[in-house]
């Protein structure tokens, strides 16, 4: 079983942890993208990514100082602890013990515009490059064309290692698109989270992102590897709805 998450824009390099870091699988590809990004001025970055001048300058500096780091340093740390968005507030990686981290390293994958696919303990440098960015590159007009089948091939290889055909997709559509069209034998389960508001259950982005983190946390803590066990998820007030669910899209409601 592999769980897929999106990355986060908010990064934190101040945490302390006792782990053995790993290196991302596609560093040479990341370096090619950085080479492309290094040619951009702050104004180009602002236009390409829809950023303020301040954020564009920050990311210009990040690209200029980026290196294909394989070891930990002040600005090269495990993705699991660096990412700090809504999903990661729900994931609560700080609460994981060594068994949890070992399980996450085997089963959790973070999709990334710059790194393609990350294991939790893969070290990353500060960056911003969303998967939907229309960055022209050596392989095409966007990052989906750049990554091609690489991410899917790696995930299929990891599923084989895990003796499983299950992907639990907790990533956004923007990121999951990079995985491409999967073979029929692969089971993809994409949980949906809805909250009660104005007399109806609806998908509210902020809560749904956190819920993806809650479910990832719950799966890691409970060592869940089978799709039928997802129905037991009940963290933070969410409950499985048999009525609204399908096999590929289990629905969880919260009042």
Language-model segments: residues:
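Active-site helix-to-loop segments that bind/position phosphate- or nucleotide-bearing substrates
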Residues: 4-95
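Internal, well-folded beta-alpha domain core
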Residues: 93-246, 251-255
């Amino acid at each position: 079983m592999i769980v897929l998450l999106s990355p986060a824009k908010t990064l934190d390099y101040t945490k302390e942890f006792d782990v053995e870091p790993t290196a991302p699988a596609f560093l040479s590809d990341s370096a090619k993208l950085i080479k492309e990004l290094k040619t951009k001025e702050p104004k180009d970055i602002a236009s390409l990514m829809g950023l303020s001048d301040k954020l564009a300058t920050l990311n210009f500096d990040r690209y200029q100082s980026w290196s294909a780091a394989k070891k930990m340093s002040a600005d090269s740390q495990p993705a699991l602890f660096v990412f700090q968005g809504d999903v990661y507030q729900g994931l609560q990686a700080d609460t994981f013990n060594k068994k949890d981290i070992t399980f996450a390293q085997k089963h959790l994958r973070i999709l990334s515009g710059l790194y393609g696919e990350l294991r939790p303990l893969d070290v990353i440098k500060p960056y911003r490059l969303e998967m939907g960015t229309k960055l022209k590159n050596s392989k095409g007009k966007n990052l989906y064309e750049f990554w091609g089948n690489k991410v899917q091939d790696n995930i299929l290889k990891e599923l084989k290692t895990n003796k499983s055909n299950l992907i639990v997709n907790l990533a956004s559509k923007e990121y999951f698109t990079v995985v491409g069209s999967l073979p029929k034998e692969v089971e993809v389960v994409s949980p949906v989270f809805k909250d009660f508001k104005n007399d109806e259950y609806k998908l509210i982005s902020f809560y749904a992102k956190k819920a993806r983190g809650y479910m990832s946390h719950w799966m890691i803590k409970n060592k869940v590897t089978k799709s039928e066990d997802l129905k037991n998820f009940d963290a933070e007030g969410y409950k499985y709805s048999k009525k609204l669910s399908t096999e590929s899209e289990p629905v969880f409601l919260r009042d």
